[in-house]
Amino acid sequence: MSSQKLLKEEHVSGLTGGSIGEIYVVTCVNLTAYVAWALLRKRYGDHSPWDVDFVIFDFLLNWLGLLLSVTIYSNQPLLLNALIIVPAGVWYIWGRRDRVKKRKELRPDFQQEKDKEVKRADKEMPFLSVYRGSMMVITCIAILAVDFNIFPRRFAKVETWGTSMMDLGVGSFVFSMGVVSKPRTDEPFGPQMKKSLKHAFPVLVLGFIRLISVKSLDYQEHVSEYGVHWNFFFTLGFLPPFVTLVGGLFKKTKIPLMGQSVIIALAYDVLLSVTSLKEYILTAPRVDIFSQNKEGIFSFIGYLAIFLAGQAVGTVILRTKLPEPTPANSKRTPHNLRYRQIIKYLTISSILFHVARLYYDGTIEINVSRRLVNMPYYLWVCAYNTFFLGCYAAIEVILVPIRASQPATPRVPLTLDAVNYNGLVIFLLANIGTGLINMSVNTLEASPAKTMVILVAYCAALSGISLVLYKKEIRLKL
Protein backbone atom coordinates (compact mmCIF):
# COMPACT_ATOMS: atom_id res chain seq x y z
CA MET A 1 0.00 0.00 0.00
CA SER A 2 1.43 3.38 -1.01
CA SER A 3 2.01 5.95 1.70
CA GLN A 4 -0.17 8.50 -0.15
CA LYS A 5 -3.05 6.03 -0.34
CA LEU A 6 -2.71 5.34 3.37
CA LEU A 7 -2.70 9.05 4.18
CA LYS A 8 -5.80 9.65 2.06
CA GLU A 9 -7.62 6.79 3.79
CA GLU A 10 -6.67 8.18 7.20
CA HIS A 11 -7.93 11.59 6.02
CA VAL A 12 -11.51 10.25 5.89
CA SER A 13 -11.33 7.74 8.77
CA GLY A 14 -12.17 7.98 12.46
CA LEU A 15 -14.31 11.11 12.10
CA THR A 16 -17.15 12.10 14.46
CA GLY A 17 -19.04 14.72 12.43
CA GLY A 18 -20.65 17.97 13.55
CA SER A 19 -23.95 19.42 14.75
CA ILE A 20 -27.26 18.99 12.97
CA GLY A 21 -28.00 22.70 13.35
CA GLU A 22 -24.85 23.68 11.47
CA ILE A 23 -25.68 21.21 8.69
CA TYR A 24 -29.09 22.83 8.24
CA VAL A 25 -27.59 26.34 8.11
CA VAL A 26 -24.88 25.36 5.62
CA THR A 27 -27.28 23.56 3.29
CA CYS A 28 -29.69 26.52 3.47
CA VAL A 29 -27.46 27.97 0.75
CA ASN A 30 -29.46 25.72 -1.60
CA LEU A 31 -32.62 27.59 -0.65
CA THR A 32 -30.93 30.99 -0.70
CA ALA A 33 -29.60 30.33 -4.20
CA TYR A 34 -33.12 29.43 -5.35
CA VAL A 35 -34.52 32.63 -3.82
CA ALA A 36 -31.81 34.72 -5.49
CA TRP A 37 -32.41 33.01 -8.84
CA ALA A 38 -36.17 33.59 -8.50
CA LEU A 39 -35.64 37.30 -7.81
CA LEU A 40 -33.36 37.67 -10.84
CA ARG A 41 -35.88 35.75 -12.94
CA LYS A 42 -38.64 38.15 -11.88
CA ARG A 43 -36.55 41.07 -13.09
CA TYR A 44 -35.33 39.50 -16.34
CA GLY A 45 -38.21 37.14 -17.01
CA ASP A 46 -38.48 37.99 -20.70
CA HIS A 47 -34.84 37.05 -21.43
CA SER A 48 -33.73 33.65 -22.68
CA PRO A 49 -32.18 31.43 -19.97
CA TRP A 50 -29.52 30.51 -22.56
CA ASP A 51 -28.15 34.07 -22.67
CA VAL A 52 -24.49 33.88 -21.64
CA ASP A 53 -24.89 36.26 -18.70
CA PHE A 54 -27.88 34.26 -17.43
CA VAL A 55 -25.99 30.98 -17.66
CA ILE A 56 -23.09 32.52 -15.73
CA PHE A 57 -25.44 33.86 -13.01
CA ASP A 58 -27.10 30.47 -12.82
CA PHE A 59 -23.76 28.67 -12.45
CA LEU A 60 -22.51 31.14 -9.84
CA LEU A 61 -25.62 30.69 -7.72
CA ASN A 62 -26.38 27.00 -8.05
CA TRP A 63 -22.86 25.56 -8.34
CA LEU A 64 -20.29 27.96 -6.94
CA GLY A 65 -22.59 29.08 -4.13
CA LEU A 66 -22.83 25.50 -2.89
CA LEU A 67 -19.09 24.99 -3.40
CA LEU A 68 -18.27 28.04 -1.28
CA SER A 69 -20.61 26.85 1.47
CA VAL A 70 -18.50 23.72 2.07
CA THR A 71 -15.09 25.31 1.54
CA ILE A 72 -14.14 28.97 2.00
CA TYR A 73 -17.34 29.97 3.85
CA SER A 74 -17.82 26.72 5.77
CA ASN A 75 -17.28 28.59 9.06
CA GLN A 76 -19.43 31.57 8.00
CA PRO A 77 -22.55 30.11 6.36
CA LEU A 78 -24.80 32.96 7.50
CA LEU A 79 -22.48 35.49 5.87
CA LEU A 80 -22.52 33.53 2.61
CA ASN A 81 -26.32 33.38 2.67
CA ALA A 82 -26.38 37.15 3.13
CA LEU A 83 -23.86 37.71 0.33
CA ILE A 84 -26.12 35.75 -2.00
CA ILE A 85 -29.53 37.08 -1.05
CA VAL A 86 -28.83 40.78 -0.33
CA PRO A 87 -27.34 41.71 -3.75
CA ALA A 88 -30.09 39.76 -5.52
CA GLY A 89 -32.74 41.56 -3.48
CA VAL A 90 -31.21 44.98 -4.14
CA TRP A 91 -30.90 44.20 -7.84
CA TYR A 92 -34.53 43.07 -7.96
CA ILE A 93 -35.85 46.20 -6.22
CA TRP A 94 -33.65 48.47 -8.32
CA GLY A 95 -35.05 46.99 -11.52
CA ARG A 96 -38.76 47.09 -10.64
CA ARG A 97 -39.42 50.27 -12.64
CA ASP A 98 -37.81 48.82 -15.77
CA ARG A 99 -39.80 45.63 -15.30
CA VAL A 100 -43.10 47.51 -15.17
CA LYS A 101 -42.28 49.24 -18.48
CA LYS A 102 -41.44 45.95 -20.17
CA ARG A 103 -44.75 44.39 -19.17
CA LYS A 104 -46.51 46.79 -21.54
CA GLU A 105 -44.54 45.39 -24.47
CA LEU A 106 -45.59 41.74 -24.14
CA ARG A 107 -46.37 39.93 -27.39
CA PRO A 108 -50.01 39.04 -28.35
CA ASP A 109 -49.56 35.27 -28.04
CA PHE A 110 -48.34 35.64 -24.46
CA GLN A 111 -51.45 34.11 -22.84
CA GLN A 112 -51.10 30.92 -24.88
CA GLU A 113 -47.54 30.49 -23.62
CA LYS A 114 -48.75 31.21 -20.11
CA ASP A 115 -51.37 28.45 -20.33
CA LYS A 116 -48.71 26.00 -21.51
CA GLU A 117 -46.43 27.01 -18.64
CA VAL A 118 -49.21 26.43 -16.09
CA LYS A 119 -49.86 22.94 -17.45
CA ARG A 120 -46.15 22.11 -17.45
CA ALA A 121 -45.69 23.43 -13.91
CA ASP A 122 -48.60 21.39 -12.57
CA LYS A 123 -47.32 18.25 -14.28
CA GLU A 124 -43.60 18.52 -13.50
CA MET A 125 -43.65 20.32 -10.13
CA PRO A 126 -40.72 22.74 -10.66
CA PHE A 127 -39.75 22.76 -6.98
CA LEU A 128 -39.10 19.01 -7.20
CA SER A 129 -36.70 19.63 -10.07
CA VAL A 130 -34.87 22.32 -8.08
CA TYR A 131 -34.68 20.05 -5.02
CA ARG A 132 -33.37 17.09 -7.02
CA GLY A 133 -30.92 19.18 -9.04
CA SER A 134 -29.50 20.89 -5.94
CA MET A 135 -29.11 17.49 -4.29
CA MET A 136 -27.11 16.21 -7.25
CA VAL A 137 -24.92 19.31 -7.39
CA ILE A 138 -23.94 19.24 -3.71
CA THR A 139 -23.31 15.49 -3.96
CA CYS A 140 -20.98 15.92 -6.94
CA ILE A 141 -19.13 18.72 -5.16
CA ALA A 142 -18.72 16.86 -1.87
CA ILE A 143 -17.35 13.59 -3.27
CA LEU A 144 -14.29 15.45 -4.61
CA ALA A 145 -14.00 18.31 -2.11
CA VAL A 146 -13.78 15.86 0.82
CA ASP A 147 -10.33 14.76 -0.37
CA PHE A 148 -8.92 18.27 0.10
CA ASN A 149 -7.98 19.92 3.40
CA ILE A 150 -10.19 22.92 2.62
CA PHE A 151 -13.25 20.70 3.17
CA PRO A 152 -13.95 20.60 6.96
CA ARG A 153 -13.55 17.16 8.53
CA ARG A 154 -16.81 17.67 10.44
CA PHE A 155 -18.65 17.61 7.09
CA ALA A 156 -17.10 14.28 6.03
CA LYS A 157 -18.69 10.90 6.76
CA VAL A 158 -18.36 9.78 10.36
CA GLU A 159 -16.79 6.46 11.27
CA THR A 160 -19.78 4.96 13.13
CA TRP A 161 -21.81 7.31 15.33
CA GLY A 162 -22.64 10.95 14.70
CA THR A 163 -24.00 13.33 12.10
CA SER A 164 -22.32 15.04 9.17
CA MET A 165 -23.32 16.73 5.95
CA MET A 166 -22.01 13.89 3.77
CA ASP A 167 -23.80 11.30 5.90
CA LEU A 168 -27.02 13.22 5.36
CA GLY A 169 -26.20 13.56 1.67
CA VAL A 170 -26.06 9.81 1.06
CA GLY A 171 -29.48 9.21 2.58
CA SER A 172 -30.92 12.30 0.91
CA PHE A 173 -29.68 11.09 -2.47
CA VAL A 174 -31.62 7.84 -1.98
CA PHE A 175 -34.67 9.71 -0.63
CA SER A 176 -34.69 12.05 -3.65
CA MET A 177 -34.55 9.06 -6.00
CA GLY A 178 -37.64 7.73 -4.28
CA VAL A 179 -39.44 11.07 -4.55
CA VAL A 180 -39.11 11.19 -8.35
CA SER A 181 -39.52 7.45 -8.98
CA LYS A 182 -42.57 6.20 -10.83
CA PRO A 183 -45.54 5.32 -8.58
CA ARG A 184 -46.47 1.67 -8.29
CA THR A 185 -48.94 0.24 -10.77
CA ASP A 186 -51.36 -2.68 -10.78
CA GLU A 187 -49.15 -4.54 -13.27
CA PRO A 188 -48.52 -8.22 -12.37
CA PHE A 189 -45.46 -8.97 -10.25
CA GLY A 190 -43.55 -10.82 -12.99
CA PRO A 191 -43.48 -8.02 -15.59
CA GLN A 192 -42.73 -5.47 -12.85
CA MET A 193 -39.74 -7.47 -11.62
CA LYS A 194 -38.49 -7.90 -15.18
CA LYS A 195 -38.56 -4.12 -15.69
CA SER A 196 -36.87 -3.55 -12.33
CA LEU A 197 -34.04 -5.96 -13.14
CA LYS A 198 -33.61 -4.32 -16.54
CA HIS A 199 -33.36 -0.93 -14.83
CA ALA A 200 -30.97 -2.26 -12.18
CA PHE A 201 -28.57 -4.08 -14.52
CA PRO A 202 -26.60 -1.07 -15.91
CA VAL A 203 -26.19 0.45 -12.44
CA LEU A 204 -24.91 -2.86 -11.06
CA VAL A 205 -22.49 -3.05 -13.99
CA LEU A 206 -21.20 0.38 -12.96
CA GLY A 207 -20.75 -1.00 -9.45
CA PHE A 208 -18.58 -3.83 -10.76
CA ILE A 209 -16.61 -1.44 -12.98
CA ARG A 210 -15.92 0.77 -9.96
CA LEU A 211 -14.93 -2.27 -7.89
CA ILE A 212 -12.48 -3.52 -10.52
CA SER A 213 -11.07 -0.02 -11.07
CA VAL A 214 -10.50 0.64 -7.37
CA LYS A 215 -8.78 -2.71 -6.81
CA SER A 216 -6.64 -2.63 -9.95
CA LEU A 217 -5.52 1.00 -9.55
CA ASP A 218 -4.81 0.66 -5.82
CA TYR A 219 -7.19 3.57 -5.19
CA GLN A 220 -7.88 4.65 -1.62
CA GLU A 221 -10.84 2.99 0.11
CA HIS A 222 -12.78 3.51 3.31
CA VAL A 223 -13.64 -0.13 4.02
CA SER A 224 -15.86 0.51 7.05
CA GLU A 225 -18.19 2.61 4.88
CA TYR A 226 -19.70 -0.21 2.76
CA GLY A 227 -17.25 -3.11 3.02
CA VAL A 228 -14.40 -4.56 1.01
CA HIS A 229 -16.23 -4.96 -2.31
CA TRP A 230 -19.55 -3.15 -1.92
CA ASN A 231 -20.00 0.42 -3.14
CA PHE A 232 -22.85 2.92 -3.48
CA PHE A 233 -23.64 1.82 -7.05
CA PHE A 234 -24.54 -1.64 -5.72
CA THR A 235 -26.91 -0.03 -3.21
CA LEU A 236 -28.55 2.01 -5.96
CA GLY A 237 -28.68 -0.95 -8.34
CA PHE A 238 -30.38 -3.34 -5.93
CA LEU A 239 -33.08 -0.83 -4.97
CA PRO A 240 -35.43 -1.31 -8.01
CA PRO A 241 -35.89 -5.11 -7.67
CA PHE A 242 -36.24 -4.96 -3.89
CA VAL A 243 -38.76 -2.11 -4.12
CA THR A 244 -40.76 -4.31 -6.50
CA LEU A 245 -40.40 -7.25 -4.10
CA VAL A 246 -41.70 -5.17 -1.18
CA GLY A 247 -44.60 -4.02 -3.35
CA GLY A 248 -45.47 -7.64 -4.09
CA LEU A 249 -45.34 -8.62 -0.41
CA PHE A 250 -47.61 -5.75 0.65
CA LYS A 251 -49.85 -5.82 -2.42
CA LYS A 252 -52.82 -7.48 -0.73
CA THR A 253 -52.62 -5.27 2.35
CA LYS A 254 -54.00 -1.76 2.72
CA ILE A 255 -50.80 -0.49 4.30
CA PRO A 256 -49.73 2.76 2.56
CA LEU A 257 -46.23 3.26 1.19
CA MET A 258 -45.07 5.30 4.18
CA GLY A 259 -46.39 2.61 6.49
CA GLN A 260 -44.41 -0.03 4.60
CA SER A 261 -41.31 2.13 4.90
CA VAL A 262 -41.72 2.58 8.65
CA ILE A 263 -42.38 -1.15 9.16
CA ILE A 264 -39.13 -2.06 7.40
CA ALA A 265 -37.15 0.59 9.30
CA LEU A 266 -38.63 -0.49 12.65
CA ALA A 267 -38.12 -4.21 11.99
CA TYR A 268 -34.48 -3.60 11.10
CA ASP A 269 -34.01 -1.39 14.16
CA VAL A 270 -35.47 -4.09 16.41
CA LEU A 271 -32.97 -6.58 14.98
CA LEU A 272 -30.16 -4.13 15.70
CA SER A 273 -31.38 -3.63 19.28
CA VAL A 274 -32.41 -7.10 20.50
CA THR A 275 -29.98 -9.32 18.61
CA SER A 276 -26.22 -9.32 18.12
CA LEU A 277 -26.60 -7.89 14.60
CA LYS A 278 -25.25 -4.46 15.57
CA GLU A 279 -22.13 -5.99 17.11
CA TYR A 280 -21.69 -8.23 14.08
CA ILE A 281 -21.80 -5.29 11.67
CA LEU A 282 -19.44 -3.15 13.73
CA THR A 283 -16.91 -5.64 15.10
CA ALA A 284 -17.10 -9.04 13.35
CA PRO A 285 -13.91 -10.08 11.52
CA ARG A 286 -14.04 -10.10 7.71
CA VAL A 287 -13.53 -13.82 7.07
CA ASP A 288 -15.72 -14.42 4.00
CA ILE A 289 -17.46 -12.55 1.18
CA PHE A 290 -20.53 -11.87 3.33
CA SER A 291 -18.71 -10.55 6.39
CA GLN A 292 -16.36 -8.57 4.16
CA ASN A 293 -19.36 -6.56 2.94
CA LYS A 294 -21.57 -6.60 6.05
CA GLU A 295 -21.96 -2.80 6.18
CA GLY A 296 -23.19 -2.56 2.61
CA ILE A 297 -25.48 -5.58 2.86
CA PHE A 298 -27.27 -4.65 6.08
CA SER A 299 -27.33 -0.88 5.56
CA PHE A 300 -29.18 -1.62 2.33
CA ILE A 301 -32.24 -2.48 4.44
CA GLY A 302 -32.24 1.03 5.86
CA TYR A 303 -31.70 2.61 2.46
CA LEU A 304 -34.61 0.58 1.10
CA ALA A 305 -36.82 2.05 3.85
CA ILE A 306 -35.55 5.56 3.03
CA PHE A 307 -36.26 5.07 -0.68
CA LEU A 308 -39.81 3.90 0.09
CA ALA A 309 -40.33 6.94 2.33
CA GLY A 310 -39.23 9.19 -0.52
CA GLN A 311 -41.50 7.32 -2.91
CA ALA A 312 -44.40 7.78 -0.49
CA VAL A 313 -43.77 11.53 -0.27
CA GLY A 314 -43.41 11.81 -4.04
CA THR A 315 -46.63 9.89 -4.63
CA VAL A 316 -48.58 12.20 -2.31
CA ILE A 317 -47.08 15.31 -3.94
CA LEU A 318 -47.83 14.21 -7.49
CA ARG A 319 -51.31 12.92 -6.70
CA THR A 320 -52.48 15.80 -4.51
CA LYS A 321 -55.89 16.89 -5.75
CA LEU A 322 -57.36 20.36 -5.72
CA PRO A 323 -59.43 21.16 -2.62
CA GLU A 324 -63.11 21.89 -3.02
CA PRO A 325 -63.75 25.59 -3.80
CA THR A 326 -64.97 27.69 -0.88
CA PRO A 327 -65.65 31.42 -0.43
CA ALA A 328 -62.30 31.67 1.38
CA ASN A 329 -60.21 30.22 -1.44
CA SER A 330 -62.26 31.23 -4.47
CA LYS A 331 -59.84 34.01 -5.40
CA ARG A 332 -56.75 31.78 -5.38
CA THR A 333 -55.52 30.00 -8.51
CA PRO A 334 -55.96 26.20 -8.67
CA HIS A 335 -52.17 25.88 -8.97
CA ASN A 336 -51.58 27.69 -5.66
CA LEU A 337 -54.40 25.82 -3.93
CA ARG A 338 -52.73 22.55 -4.84
CA TYR A 339 -49.39 23.79 -3.53
CA ARG A 340 -50.98 24.86 -0.24
CA GLN A 341 -52.09 21.26 0.27
CA ILE A 342 -48.62 19.96 -0.60
CA ILE A 343 -46.85 22.39 1.75
CA LYS A 344 -49.26 21.48 4.53
CA TYR A 345 -48.53 17.77 4.04
CA LEU A 346 -44.75 18.32 3.96
CA THR A 347 -44.84 20.54 7.05
CA ILE A 348 -46.80 18.02 9.10
CA SER A 349 -44.57 15.17 7.90
CA SER A 350 -41.41 17.08 8.76
CA ILE A 351 -42.69 17.92 12.26
CA LEU A 352 -43.58 14.28 12.94
CA PHE A 353 -40.21 13.01 11.71
CA HIS A 354 -38.32 15.63 13.73
CA VAL A 355 -40.28 14.83 16.89
CA ALA A 356 -39.66 11.10 16.42
CA ARG A 357 -35.94 11.70 15.91
CA LEU A 358 -35.74 13.87 19.04
CA TYR A 359 -37.55 11.10 20.96
CA TYR A 360 -34.94 8.57 19.89
CA ASP A 361 -32.15 10.99 20.72
CA GLY A 362 -33.46 12.16 24.10
CA THR A 363 -35.50 9.26 25.48
CA ILE A 364 -34.20 6.04 23.95
CA GLU A 365 -30.70 7.53 23.60
CA ILE A 366 -29.78 5.81 20.35
CA ASN A 367 -27.38 7.85 18.24
CA VAL A 368 -27.51 8.39 14.49
CA SER A 369 -25.41 5.93 12.49
CA ARG A 370 -25.09 6.15 8.73
CA ARG A 371 -22.88 3.05 8.83
CA LEU A 372 -25.82 1.06 10.22
CA VAL A 373 -28.57 3.21 8.65
CA ASN A 374 -30.48 2.78 11.89
CA MET A 375 -33.83 4.27 12.88
CA PRO A 376 -32.46 7.64 14.09
CA TYR A 377 -30.64 8.04 10.77
CA TYR A 378 -33.79 7.09 8.84
CA LEU A 379 -35.86 9.64 10.79
CA TRP A 380 -33.24 12.36 10.35
CA VAL A 381 -33.05 11.90 6.58
CA CYS A 382 -36.85 11.92 6.24
CA ALA A 383 -37.21 14.94 8.55
CA TYR A 384 -34.59 16.97 6.70
CA ASN A 385 -35.88 16.21 3.22
CA THR A 386 -39.56 16.83 3.95
CA PHE A 387 -38.60 20.13 5.60
CA PHE A 388 -36.51 21.30 2.65
CA LEU A 389 -39.06 20.10 0.11
CA GLY A 390 -41.64 22.23 1.90
CA CYS A 391 -39.28 25.22 1.77
CA TYR A 392 -38.68 24.76 -1.96
CA ALA A 393 -42.42 24.55 -2.58
CA ALA A 394 -43.06 27.69 -0.51
CA ILE A 395 -40.37 29.63 -2.39
CA GLU A 396 -41.92 28.62 -5.69
CA VAL A 397 -45.41 29.73 -4.64
CA ILE A 398 -44.19 33.06 -3.29
CA LEU A 399 -41.44 34.02 -5.74
CA VAL A 400 -42.08 31.98 -8.87
CA PRO A 401 -45.88 32.24 -9.23
CA ILE A 402 -47.72 31.91 -12.51
CA ARG A 403 -49.52 35.19 -13.17
CA ALA A 404 -51.03 36.62 -16.31
CA SER A 405 -48.99 39.80 -15.95
CA GLN A 406 -45.64 38.02 -16.13
CA PRO A 407 -43.81 36.44 -19.08
CA ALA A 408 -43.92 32.68 -19.58
CA THR A 409 -40.39 31.98 -18.36
CA PRO A 410 -38.57 28.85 -17.14
CA ARG A 411 -39.41 27.99 -13.55
CA VAL A 412 -36.29 25.92 -12.82
CA PRO A 413 -32.68 27.17 -12.99
CA LEU A 414 -31.17 26.04 -16.29
CA THR A 415 -28.08 24.43 -14.75
CA LEU A 416 -30.26 22.33 -12.43
CA ASP A 417 -32.62 21.33 -15.24
CA ALA A 418 -29.59 20.23 -17.24
CA VAL A 419 -28.23 18.13 -14.37
CA ASN A 420 -31.60 16.43 -13.90
CA TYR A 421 -31.81 15.65 -17.62
CA ASN A 422 -28.89 13.20 -17.29
CA GLY A 423 -28.68 12.79 -13.52
CA LEU A 424 -27.06 9.37 -13.25
CA VAL A 425 -24.65 10.14 -16.09
CA ILE A 426 -23.48 13.32 -14.36
CA PHE A 427 -23.08 11.39 -11.09
CA LEU A 428 -20.98 8.80 -12.93
CA LEU A 429 -18.84 11.52 -14.54
CA ALA A 430 -18.37 13.11 -11.10
CA ASN A 431 -17.06 9.80 -9.77
CA ILE A 432 -14.72 9.40 -12.75
CA GLY A 433 -13.52 12.99 -12.42
CA THR A 434 -12.91 12.50 -8.70
CA GLY A 435 -10.82 9.42 -9.41
CA LEU A 436 -8.76 11.08 -12.14
CA ILE A 437 -8.04 14.15 -10.02
CA ASN A 438 -7.05 12.04 -7.02
CA MET A 439 -4.64 10.00 -9.13
CA SER A 440 -3.03 13.06 -10.69
CA VAL A 441 -2.96 15.48 -7.74
CA ASN A 442 -1.81 15.11 -4.15
CA THR A 443 -5.02 16.53 -2.73
CA LEU A 444 -3.73 16.59 0.85
CA GLU A 445 -0.87 18.96 0.01
CA ALA A 446 -2.76 21.24 -2.39
CA SER A 447 -2.84 24.89 -1.31
CA PRO A 448 -6.23 26.58 -0.79
CA ALA A 449 -5.80 28.54 -4.05
CA LYS A 450 -4.90 25.44 -6.07
CA THR A 451 -7.74 23.53 -4.43
CA MET A 452 -10.33 26.13 -5.41
CA VAL A 453 -9.03 26.30 -8.99
CA ILE A 454 -9.39 22.52 -9.28
CA LEU A 455 -12.85 22.46 -7.69
CA VAL A 456 -14.18 25.35 -9.77
CA ALA A 457 -12.85 23.76 -12.97
CA TYR A 458 -14.41 20.44 -11.95
CA CYS A 459 -17.79 22.11 -11.32
CA ALA A 460 -17.57 24.03 -14.60
CA ALA A 461 -16.79 20.83 -16.50
CA LEU A 462 -19.73 18.90 -15.02
CA SER A 463 -22.12 21.81 -15.51
CA GLY A 464 -20.84 22.45 -19.04
CA ILE A 465 -21.25 18.81 -20.09
CA SER A 466 -24.77 18.68 -18.64
CA LEU A 467 -25.72 21.91 -20.45
CA VAL A 468 -24.41 20.66 -23.81
CA LEU A 469 -26.31 17.39 -23.49
CA TYR A 470 -29.45 19.27 -22.43
CA LYS A 471 -29.16 21.81 -25.26
CA LYS A 472 -28.79 19.05 -27.85
CA GLU A 473 -31.55 16.99 -26.18
CA ILE A 474 -29.21 14.03 -25.69
CA ARG A 475 -30.50 11.86 -22.86
CA LEU A 476 -28.12 9.03 -21.96
CA LYS A 477 -29.97 6.30 -20.09
CA LEU A 478 -28.04 3.92 -17.87
From Swiss-Prot:
Listed GO biological process terms: GPI anchor biosynthetic process
Glycan-modified residues: N367
Top-rank taxon: Eukaryota
Membrane topology recorded in Swiss-Prot or TrEMBL: Multi-pass membrane protein
Transmembrane segments: 20-40, 52-72, 75-95, 126-146, 160-180, 196-213, 230-250, 255-275, 297-317, 380-400, 424-444, 449-469
Localisation per UniProt entry: Endoplasmic reticulum membrane
First-level EC class: transferase
Pfam families: GWT1
Single Gene Ontology MF annotation: glucosaminyl-phosphatidylinositol O-acyltransferase activity
EC number: 2.3.-.-
Signal peptide positions (record): none
Primary location group: endoplasmic reticulum
Annotated keywords: Acyltransferase, Endoplasmic reticulum, Glycoprotein, GPI-anchor biosynthesis, Membrane, Transferase, Transmembrane, Transmembrane helix
GO terms under cellular component: endoplasmic reticulum membrane
Biological pathway: Glycolipid biosynthesis; glycosylphosphatidylinositol-anchor biosynthesis
Function: Probable acetyltransferase, which acetylates the inositol ring of phosphatidylinositol during biosynthesis of GPI-anchor.
Family: Belongs to the PIGW family.
Stated name of the protein: GPI-anchored wall transfer protein 1
Species in which this protein is naturally found: Yarrowia lipolytica (strain CLIB 122 / E 150)
